[in-house]
Amino acid sequence: MRGERGSKPSVYSLFFDGVLTRTDPERAHHGAFRAIRAARPVLASRRTPGEQVTALGLTFPNVLGLAAGFDKNAVGIDALAALGFGHVEIGTVTGEPQPGNPKPRLFRLPEDRAIVNRMGFNNDGAEVVARRLAERSRGRDRLGHRSRPVLGVNIGKSKVVPDDDQAAVEADYEKSARLLAPYADYLVVNVSSPNTPGLRNLQAVEKLRPLLEHVRRTADAVTRTRVPLLVKIAPDLADEDVLGVADLALAIGLDGIIATNTTISRAGLRTPADRVGEIGAGGLSGRPLTGRALEVLRLLRERVGPDLTLVGVGGISTVQDARDRLTAGADLLQAYSAFVYEGPLWPRRIVRGVA
């Protein structure tokens, strides 16, 4: 939380250590997000930093995006972009609205600069989010064309849908794709969150292939311009399964892979074991994920060559982390946990550092 590791603490770092660490993490998230949205009129005048990147057939203002999970319901896209993110990925959005798992469900591990979450895809549902995106689109049309962030829409399985009913799973993702693809610059199929029972089973190639093909057909049916489709995978996949997903992506003409989601591993943490045990289940994000996320990215790039867009995410905290991910083959980067720990100036610092 010191910007680059070992540098002087920032004002935000001191505030985080002194105040936010004593506040319930989910409450702090909502408070910070409200503040960001309120500051949008001031932030909107700032030029987006960094150099443009072409990927997925799209022009991104810069290489760094905000990963799904921060803005689940598409309520602060443009305010977040004004902080310096070149793309914002909303969601995960499910076909049906759902409250998510019982609270508490979000935990900080400050010693590891990590977060554990078991949110459970709490969101307003595809119908409500689609209406919100439609309203945003109409508002932008009224104001005339202006520079904007690239918008990713991340869709996942509703908890009420059994993972062993392939037809029901496909119908659930179809609903989200049908409603949301018209507003997405790119679409992401999330099959890798550990917080929806059975979801990760859908990463098996025999289940993943028909699902991705079904979402592709659905998106094509409701859009005039082809919307790029990506899949987000877990760091906990065995290497051979990572390669299997890579081969599948090439075989069916997927546009890209996001690597990686959170991990269920707790290996190598500095946080005391009793505290980790007390927190319990959930996906771990942040600095401990850096090594494995980098490994998965390298595996993917070696397998797919230049043919797919790869988005590197997981444990990117410093400019050097970002450079390492780009060197390993990432076309784009995403972050979440470091943004929470480092504060609103962090995106611009990373973008300028890799430019």
UniProtKB/Swiss-Prot annotation:
User: Where are its TM segments located?
Assistant: none
> Which ranges of the sequence are coiled-coil?
none
Quote the record's cofactor note.
Answer: Binds 1 FMN per subunit.
Reaction catalyzed: (S)-dihydroorotate + a quinone = orotate + a quinol
Predominant location category: membrane
A Pfam family per the record: DHO_dh
Membrane topology listed for this record: Peripheral membrane protein
What cofactor does this one take?
FMN
Q: Does the keyword Membrane apply?
A: yes
Query: Which major enzyme category is it?
Result: oxidoreductase
Q: What is its EC number?
A: 1.3.5.2
Q: Name one GO molecular function term.
A: dihydroorotate dehydrogenase (quinone) activity
* Cell compartment(s), UniProt: Cell membrane
Question: What exactly does this protein do?
Answer: Catalyzes the conversion of dihydroorotate to orotate with quinone as electron acceptor.
Under which name does UniProt file this protein?
Dihydroorotate dehydrogenase (quinone)
State the species of origin: Nocardioides sp. (strain ATCC BAA-499 / JS614)
Organismal lineage: Bacteria, Bacillati, Actinomycetota, Actinomycetes, Propionibacteriales
Q: Which gene encodes it?
A: pyrD
